[in-house]
């Protein structure tokens, strides 16, 4: 193991362990993080983080935040996080379909923005499940 990953939400420490590799969804695309990565502070988009430990991948849906990478320490502050293996597939699929419909029916700018955010969150939860299946 080469990286120390710590993921924190407002109400709890979500993850705190050594990892081999991390793949993050940033506002400018996905980035991979390995040992001795260049120091970086980046905004995280709503999406999935992939974490490799002992050659096995774990996924988690992250609902936006920030990541700081420095000296093999990765600290992630998120609004909310959910491990892929803890998400109910049926619930996630239903929520995804509902948010798709809401997005299509949105009329005002505010409704469109709110519907897009809800859709991105639902999509991230569904992707976190499908990546581990």
Curated annotation (Swiss-Prot):
One of the record's GO molecular function terms: proton-transporting ATP synthase activity, rotational mechanism
Principal cellular location given in the protein's record: plastid
Membrane-spanning parts: none
Entry keywords, A to Z: ATP synthesis, CF(1), Chloroplast, Hydrogen ion transport, Ion transport, Membrane, Plastid, Thylakoid, Transport
InterPro entries to which the protein is assigned, alphabetical: ATP_synth_F1_dsu/esu, ATP_synth_F1_dsu/esu_N, ATP_synth_F1_esu_C, ATPsynth_dsu/esu_N
Membrane-topology descriptor: Peripheral membrane protein
Oligomer status and interactors: F-type ATPases have 2 components, CF(1) - the catalytic core - and CF(0) - the membrane proton channel. CF(1) has five subunits: alpha(3), beta(3), gamma(1), delta(1), epsilon(1). CF(0) has three main subunits: a, b and c.
Family in the record: Belongs to the ATPase epsilon chain family.
Protein name: ATP synthase epsilon chain, chloroplastic
